[in-house]
C-alpha cells in the first residue's frame, strides 16, 4: 500500500484513539464529581442521615376565606422518591387529588353548584445542603400537570380544563435532634385557580425502620392549610 493510502488510515486511527481517551477522561471527571459530592454529603456531621428512598402518602385540608368566590378543598397526595443513601438529594414522582368541600365558584361566578376536582401528576428534584452542624438549606423544583373536572356553564370559560406549571420550594431547616427537624420556607409558582399559599412550615420526625412522619402548615393571604404525611422506606 502506498504512502498516500497509509496517511488517511493513520489519521483515522489517531482520531479514534483521541476520542476514546477524551471520552474516558470526561467519564472519569463526571464520576469523580458525583463521588466527591456523595462522599461529602455522607461523611459530614449532619443529622438525619438515615433518610432513604421511600413512598410518602399525605392528607390535608385547605381553608380559603378570601370570599364566597373561593372554596375549601381536601387534598390527597402520594410521592415516590429515589434518593441518595444520605437522603440529601434525589428525584421524585408525585400524584395528587384535590376536591372541594362545598359547591365550587370562581371570582366571576358560580360553577353551576358543581364541586371541582383537580387531579395532578408531577415530578422534580430536591437538594439539602449542610450549613452548620444543626442548620441546613433545602430546595425543591417540580413540574406539574393538572386536569380539572367540574360543570362548566354554557358558553362561559371560567376555569381551564388542563393546566401545567412549575413550582419551587426553598428554605432553612433546623435539626433539633437526630430524629426531629423543623423547616421554614417559601413556595413560588402555581396555578391561578389554586390557593395562594406562600409560606410553609413543617416538622419531620424519623420513626423506626426508615419511616418518617411529617406535619406541614402552609399560609397565604386569607388562606391556610395543614397536611400530615407518612413515609415508608423500602
Label for each model-derived stretch:
Residues 20-90, 96-101:
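Short glycine/proline- and aromatic-enriched beta-strand/turn motifs that initiate or cap beta-hairpins
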Residues 1-8:
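Bacterial N-terminal signal peptides that target proteins for export
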Residues 71-77, 118-122, 165-169, 196-198, ...:
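Transmembrane beta-barrel architecture of outer-membrane proteins
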Residues 27, 53-63, 91-95, 137-144, ...:
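Transmembrane beta-strand segments that form the barrel wall of outer-membrane beta-barrel proteins
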Residues 118-189:
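Detector for outer-membrane/organellar transmembrane beta-barrel domains
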Amino acid at each position: 500500500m502506498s504512502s498516500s493510502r497509509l496517511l488517511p488510515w493513520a489519521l483515522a486511527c489517531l482520531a479514534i484513539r483521541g476520542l476514546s481517551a477524551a471520552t474516558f477522561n470526561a467519564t472519569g471527571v463526571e464520576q469523580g464529581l458525583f463521588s466527591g459530592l456523595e462522599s461529602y454529603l455522607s461523611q459530614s456531621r449532619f443529622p438525619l442521615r438515615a433518610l432513604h428512598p421511600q413512598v410518602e402518602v399525605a392528607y390535608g385540608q385547605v381553608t380559603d376565606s378570601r370570599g364566597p368566590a373561593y372554596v375549601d378543598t381536601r387534598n390527597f397526595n402520594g410521592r415516590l422518591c429515589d434518593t441518595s443513601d444520605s437522603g440529601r438529594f434525589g428525584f421524585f414522582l408525585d400524584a395528587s387529588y384535590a376536591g372541594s368541600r362545598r359547591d365550587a365558584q370562581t371570582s366571576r361566578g358560580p360553577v353551576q353548584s358543581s364541586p371541582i376536582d383537580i387531579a395532578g401528576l408531577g415530578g422534580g428534584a430536591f437538594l439539602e445542603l449542610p450549613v452548620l452542624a444543626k442548620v441546613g438549606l433545602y430546595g425543591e423544583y417540580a413540574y406539574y400537570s393538572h386536569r380539572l373536572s367540574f360543570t362548566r356553564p354554557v358558553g362561559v370559560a371560567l376555569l381551564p380544563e388542563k393546566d401545567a406549571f412549575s413550582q419551587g420550594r426553598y428554605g432553612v431547616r433546623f435539626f433539633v435532634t437526630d430524629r426531629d427537624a423543623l423547616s421554614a420556607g417559601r413556595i413560588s409558582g402555581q396555578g391561578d385557580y389554586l390557593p395562594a399559599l406562600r409560606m410553609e412550615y413543617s416538622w419531620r420526625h424519623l420513626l423506626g425502620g426508615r419511616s418518617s412522619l411529617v406535619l406541614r402548615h402552609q399560609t397565604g393571604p386569607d388562606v391556610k392549610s395543614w397536611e400530615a404525611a407518612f413515609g415508608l422506606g423500602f
